[in-house]
């Protein structure tokens, strides 16, 4: 299985290039790049007001207002400090600004933090409910994040656990079958590792935890994946790794479904080619009459 990168590769490469050029004393070059990420996220790297000595990175998330209810702004200010603009670029939710004339000697941490902007936006809601669990607080309203147009994430804290539920829509009947097989591997994985979180999967109807939500989607192509996170997954030492892995689980699942379909199609095409070769070798040659230059006929064997 492939673990998706937590840091956006385009941001890493562009910022490393621009920062290296600035530290070497090179002439600043203009940049204006817009690109997409999973979950409908949109990024933009550009120069503010045409000033090539500065670079701004902006992100747009359709569900950012829901994350703001769980402290997203405060967490981002804590992580990015003075690099976070008080007013984001028009059409975006968050904007970071970097002065190429005032860079630290080592820009590695700067680049890594910037390329994890989407992850850090997501982190606020997880950290909030992890803290509820650590303090033994129950009864807080369940967090509902509509991270895609037809898919939702639910988070709820208990005194001994945090439950994270993803609803996802399978576009194809084949995806449902492959998804079920794939998720069964998570259950098997827990048998091999007792420290892994419990993973439950239901198809068609929401799990019992969401029975009180009439808006929870129902349908043959709707799946619900439930993670039960215990204190060993949510404590201060392990929470960052947990957030890294779980916030992108939906993308991870569908990415592997697509990879599995590609693999199956490739194998099927290879088998078809092999069968055609066998059939061609087994095909009998057709006997036919041929004539010589003088009009005599003869049969080919």
Curated annotation (Swiss-Prot):
Cellular localization per UniProt: Cytoplasm, Cytoskeleton
Keywords, comma-separated and alphabetical: Actin-binding, Cytoplasm, Cytoskeleton
InterPro entries for this protein: ARPC2 (IPR007188), ARPC2/4 (IPR034666)
One annotated Gene Ontology cellular component of this protein: Arp2/3 protein complex
Gene Ontology biological process terms in this record: actin filament polymerization; Arp2/3 complex-mediated actin nucleation; epithelial cell migration; morphogenesis of embryonic epithelium
GO molecular function: actin filament binding; structural constituent of cytoskeleton
Major localisation: cytoplasm
Positions in coiled-coil regions: none
Record bears the keyword Cytoplasm: yes
Phenotype of gene-disrupted mutants: RNAi-mediated knockdown suppresses the memory retention defects of the msi-1 os1 loss of function mutant.
SUPFAM superfamilies in alphabetical order: Arp2/3 complex subunits
Family assignment from sequence similarity: Belongs to the ARPC2 family.
Binding partners and assembly: Component of the Arp2/3 complex, at least composed of arx-1, arx-2, arx-4 and arx-6.
Free-text function comment from the UniProt entry: Functions as actin-binding component of the Arp2/3 complex which is involved in regulation of actin polymerization and together with an activating nucleation-promoting factor (NPF) mediates the formation of branched actin networks. Seems to contact the mother actin filament. Plays a role in time-dependent memory loss and the retention of conditioned behavior over time.
Entry protein name: Probable actin-related protein 2/3 complex subunit 2
